[in-house]
Amino acid sequence: MTDALRYLTERDVVSVLDIPKAIEALHAMLVAQGREQARNLPKALATWGDGSSMHALGSVQTGAGGYAGFKTWVHTKSGGGSLFSLFDAESGFLRAVIEARALGMLRTAAISGVA
């Protein structure tokens, strides 16, 4: 893998990820978590003003080829946005920044398929 940082837009995400792939990925990570090869970071939340909020959560897959990632997002009355930062879990190198709205929707939909 090269050391180039990738930026993926919402369009990029939906062009390469679909529900079957998301189900497969979630299943694999739940198995890894059961084997103590993956961990989740509890969600953090802060609020301000009249209903604005910021959120963060993350997970890591340990071992060779593992990744650590954080989804962060903000909601305000004027709008919001979300990003996923993906790191190499061994080197700590930032591999990608991914626009995360579609990614989150696919994950939420796919978890039902895992069940």
Where in the sequence are the language-model features?
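N-terminal ligand-binding/catalytic initiation module
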Residues: 1-105, 111-113
